[in-house]
Amino acid sequence: MLSKQIPLGIYEKALPAGECWLERLQLAKTLGFDFVEMSVDETDDRLSRLNWSREQRLALVNAIVETGVRVPSMCLSAHRRFPLGSEDDAVRAQGLEIMRKAIQFAQDVGIRVIQLAGYDVYYQEANNETRRRFRDGLKESVEMASRAQVTLAMEIMDYPLMSSISKALGYAHYLNNPWFQLYPDIGNLSAWDNDVQMELQAGIGHIVAVHVKDTKPGVFKNVPFGEGVVDFERCFETLKQSGYCGPYLIEMWSETAEDPAAEVAKARDWVKARMAKAGMVEAA
């Protein structure tokens, strides 16, 4: 029988860097996490994962089976470098090819959700044409994902185009496809001028996972838990009362810290204490 516990995961970039997934999943298990979210970012190293051999993919699957720690989601931020809204046809084609490979990779190793970065372009100036190309690129991507039975889920971003659940829902309604859903980040959502609780309620029925991090206005990364503006307890209460039962993912970038495991354990305890206050988990 499946556990009724809230699934709590950790972002790959919170754990020590390296390519040994057995070691990474063993550490995540030791730290008490149910799953790890893989990163495929714009660096050549992480992008190269999409070209893994059959044997490399099988090694990841075997590590999951051996440890019991799942890898159910991928954070696909490579589209910052190869955006779907690019006005350069070659760059945009690369972006679509990355999407195709990511969906195939997910299908091969059992990843269910690919979190998308909501940028039409990142390093260039946005305009109506970049937004149109982005929409068309999403439509093509969701068609690929539908055939593979892999969910694409839009993150709420550090970028005006996708700064709220309401904006992301506009794309969900435009695409009108069950394989396109939302993956909000309560940190990013709180850093903008949003009614956070109303936004979370509006997304219920489309939210497939939740990123957990702290932020400040204009500061979207590396804000220690408890030092930002996020009202975690209230967010957790809203999600619980709205009927959300899905996974939560602690997002951190401590892979280069002196002791990443200690940083992660501290964050885990802090987050679980807020979850306990919200009645989601038992107090430690």
From Swiss-Prot:
Pathway listed: Cofactor degradation; L-ascorbate degradation; D-xylulose 5-phosphate from L-ascorbate: step 3/4
Domain of life (superkingdom): Bacteria
GO molecular function, one term: intramolecular oxidoreductase activity, interconverting aldoses and ketoses
Matches recorded under InterPro entries: L-Ru-5P_3-Epase, L-Ru-5P_3-Epase_Enterobacteria, Sugar_Epim/Isomerase, Xyl_isomerase-like_sf, Xyl_isomerase-like_TIM-brl
EC number per UniProt: 5.1.3.22
Any Pfam family matching the protein: AP_endonuc_2
Induction: Induced by L-ascorbate. Repressed by UlaR.
One biological process term in Gene Ontology: L-ascorbic acid catabolic process
Catalyzed chemical reaction(s): L-ribulose 5-phosphate = L-xylulose 5-phosphate
Keyword terms of this UniProt record: Isomerase
Family note: Belongs to the L-ribulose-5-phosphate 3-epimerase family.
Biological function: Catalyzes the isomerization of L-xylulose-5-phosphate to L-ribulose-5-phosphate. Is involved in the anaerobic L-ascorbate utilization.
Protein name: L-ribulose-5-phosphate 3-epimerase UlaE
